Amino acid sequence: MTEKYHDGDPMSDVISGDYRMLQILSRFGITLGFGDKSVSDTCKAAGVDVSTFLTVVNYVKDPSRAHINDMVEQVDLPALIRYLKNSHSFFVDFRLPNIRRRLIEALDCSASNQIAFLILKFYDEYAAEVAHHMEYENTHVHPFVESLLRGELPSETFAAVTDQHLSLIHISE
């Protein structure tokens, strides 16, 4: 059984056990060089909501132990939206192009190899769908939630946002 991380734990303990935590630090805008500082001190120094950070870290560490209702109450939505936008940027700007480069390196892309070109075409279409989906979230879903948090009634209804979001998911299936 894995234990949850807490605000008093050293941040170095969080990253030493799982390399994925480095990506989470980056997406929250936390840089390395925190030494022996606690999670709380590190997050506060970086202007990151401690509860939101711990919720994401503990969920990634062990999703089976996550209690979604407890998590919702602890999360600062603007902090989570920033994290999600940074995650989208990482995937669209770095991860997807890196996967494509590795595919090209692994495939025989000679003029006579149509299979390689079909694989690349399929990947490019998939990557475009993922990028489109993330762009939709960044331009519609996140602003919708942000306007609700400001107490404004958005011009789009929740049903319109979710219907469009679901249609994007079904396109990629």
Model region roles, listed by residue range:
Residues 1-172:
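Small-residue-biased structural context
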